[in-house]
């Protein structure tokens, strides 16, 4: 059975997250098809939302990303600019997120996420218990 869960992307869509409202709007509008694994920001493969930045690094004839940590010397100022001017840098912003992004539609409080997960867990346990009672 399951012994854990990967939940990193969920925390990008909570009120308490340190990312910008513009990033959260981009996540809410995206589907899994809007993501790509790219080394263009960190030098290591990272799933993120596709945009003009990621497409430029994938364009034939353009240089390959450097390895980590050197690639961040190329992208670090761009990442800082997207945090400082999020409305003006949407097309080149670093928006790391998993393929689950298509299920993240609204910004919630962290406490609401935990309460929802507990409810969903209890509902699932109830359904499993009902299956055991059938036999």
Give the ranges of each region predicted by the language model.
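Conserved active-site-proximal phosphate/metal-binding subdomains
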Residues: 1-135
């Amino acid at each position: 059975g399951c012994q854990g869960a990967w939940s990193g992307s969920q925390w990008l869509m909570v009120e308490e997250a340190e990312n910008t409202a513009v990033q959260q709007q981009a996540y809410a509008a995206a589907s899994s098809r809007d993501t790509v694994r790219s080394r263009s920001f960190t030098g290591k493969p990272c799933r993120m939302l596709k945009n003009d930045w990621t497409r430029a690094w994938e364009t034939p004839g353009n240089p390959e990303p450097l390895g980590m940590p050197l690639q961040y010397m190329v992208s670090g100022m761009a990442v800082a600019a997207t945090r400082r001017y999020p409305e003006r840098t949407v097309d080149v912003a670093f928006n790391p997120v998993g393929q689950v992004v298509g299920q993240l539609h609204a910004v919630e409080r962290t406490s609401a996420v935990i309460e929802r997960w507990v409810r969903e867990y209890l509902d699932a346990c109830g359904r499993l218990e009902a299956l055991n009672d059938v036999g």
